Amino acid sequence: MTLTASSSSRAVTNSPVVVALDYHNRDDALAFVDKIDPRDCRLKVGKEMFTLFGPQFVRELQQRGFDIFLDLKFHDIPNTAAHAVAAAADLGVWMVNVHASGGARMMTAAREALVPFGKDAPLLIAVTVLTSMEASDLVDLGMTLSPADYAERLAALTQKCGLDGVVCSAQEAVRFKQVFGQEFKLVTPGIRPQGSEAGDQRRIMTPEQALSAGVDYMVIGRPVTQSVDPAQTLKAINASLQRSA
């Protein structure tokens, strides 16, 4: 399926599903994308694919009607991070992220860089604690807080800086919705339908559980991209979410 769209006229989806594209080969990625419908999900492009294929690959996905989460986790001095976020907005992506551990000045600069884009600005999300990290990993970094407590501290800083939300584990979602309110968006990786392997994610949850926990956007990768019928898999996930709503 190929749809023609621009940043202002993409296919609209109400689905909270964001499919993580993790391909080494551009043609394989596009072959997968052409099997699914932009009404059923958004797409996430991360560091590897963006480094391999660049902004033009994002444009090709947008031309097929998909909203794009550009998952590059910017973490730099404030001026550099701000310019990077503005470049993502120029590309017309739907969502872009930074590391909350970059600090308040960096996050504020990133937010201010999006002001000129007005209603066309992408959602600006901060990464708290990577879902692969456990308490022992934080101890190695000199942190005595649990992953949940550290993530909440970073989320509070993110909200104070005026960003749209955070990337967090599904286990933190219930608490975060209570503390930060319904408008503060929660984006959660490590979401896997029942029966899927955990892979390299440590803190995982099913789509239905994530929805109940208050997750706004759930990132799902291999259970969809490696499915023999990804379009049907997406429809089944969305149907289960509608039943759970």
Swiss-Prot record:
The active site is at 73 (proton donor). One of its GO terms (cellular component) is cytoplasm. Pfam families: OMPdecase (PF00215). Pathway: Pyrimidine metabolism; UMP biosynthesis via de novo pathway; UMP from orotate: step 2/2. It is an enzyme of class 4 (lyase). Belongs to the OMP decarboxylase family. Type 1 subfamily. Homodimer. This is Orotidine 5'-phosphate decarboxylase. The gene is pyrF.
